[in-house]
């Protein structure tokens, strides 16, 4: 379990769920609204995607065969180390990821500790040591067919993917890994948000919970 909130430099809110379930939308909505309501810059977002393994040693064809929905595709020990450093009030260097090249960039992002850290990613609740660093865990629940449509649109427009590659990946790894790892991790969530990223009531409840936690610091 996380240490007492009063002794932490930051509060960690984790938002997990299927790929394209609405995690990023909820994270960005909470970020923007709390930043305005609290009149504070002391809130930021970390994406689990930044912690995909470096694949410089692989060819592009080999990278395209990587199972990016399996926990082994991530360097989770580094994410845990970074969360602990942030909670101690120390800055970190977050890796940066290139979706088109399926690999880390050579650059990294300097990240200062904030009072509120919103962590979003598909596999966050599958890893016990990450769960132990989380103060509030959320699982965004959305129908898989809706997630597939959103992912197809997103990857074609934002990530430079081909339609065939997205469809193949969803069939071979995304759906099977969701059923094997991600959906079972829902049991570890403090809050389950149905209807994806546009659930206004759930967002307001989550914001109220974060404000309550802040009042204890």
UniProtKB/Swiss-Prot annotation:
Annotated S-S bridges = none
Instruction: From the UniProt record, give the pathway where this protein acts.
Output: Pyrimidine metabolism; CTP biosynthesis via salvage pathway; CTP from cytidine: step 1/3; Pyrimidine metabolism; UMP biosynthesis via salvage pathway; UMP from uridine: step 1/1
Q: Which GO terms describe its molecular function?
A: ATP binding; cytidine kinase activity; uridine kinase activity
A Pfam cross-reference name: PRK
- The keyword Nucleotidyltransferase is assigned to this record: no
Keyword field: ATP-binding, Cytoplasm, Kinase, Nucleotide-binding, Transferase
Q: Which GO terms describe its cellular component?
A: cytoplasm
Root EC class = transferase
What Enzyme Commission number(s) appear in the record? 2.7.1.48
A Gene Ontology annotation in the biological process aspect, one of them, is: CTP salvage
Enumerate the catalysed reactions.
uridine + ATP = UMP + ADP + H(+); cytidine + ATP = CMP + ADP + H(+)
Where's it found, cell-wise?
Cytoplasm
Residues reported in the UniProt entry to bind ATP: 17-24
- Decide whether keyword Membrane is in the record: no
Primary localization class, coarse:
cytoplasm
- Return the similarity comment: Belongs to the uridine kinase family.
PANTHER family registered for this protein in UniProt: URIDINE KINASE
Protein name (Swiss-Prot/TrEMBL): Uridine kinase
| Highest classification ranks of the organism | Bacteria, Pseudomonadati, Pseudomonadota, Gammaproteobacteria, Pasteurellales
């Amino acid at each position: 379990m996380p240490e007492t909130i009063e002794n932490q430099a930051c509060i960690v809110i984790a938002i997990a769920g299927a790929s394209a379930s609405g995690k990023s939308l909820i994270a960005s909505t909470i970020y923007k609204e709390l930043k305005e309501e609290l009149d504070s810059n002391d809130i930021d977002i970390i994406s689990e995607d930044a912690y995909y393994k470096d694949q410089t040693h692989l060819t592009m064809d080999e990278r395209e065969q990587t199972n990016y929905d399996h926990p082994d595709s991530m360097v989770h020990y580094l994410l845990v180390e970074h969360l602990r450093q942030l909670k101690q009030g120390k800055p970190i260097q977050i890796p940066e990821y290139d979706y088109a090249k399926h690999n880390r960039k050579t650059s990294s992002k300097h990240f200062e500790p904030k009072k509120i850290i919103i962590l979003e990613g598909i596999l966050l609740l599958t890893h016990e040591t990450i769960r132990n660093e989380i103060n509030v865990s959320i699982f965004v629940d959305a129908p898989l067919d809706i997630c597939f449509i959103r992912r197809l649109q997103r990857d074609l427009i934002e990530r430079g993917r081909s339609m065939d590659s997205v469809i193949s990946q969803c069939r071979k790894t995304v759906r099977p890994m969701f059923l094997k790892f991600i959906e079972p991790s829902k049991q570890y969530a403090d809050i389950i948000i149905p209807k994806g990223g546009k659930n206004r009531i759930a967002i307001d409840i989550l914001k109220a919970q974060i404000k309550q936690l802040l009042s204890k610091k």
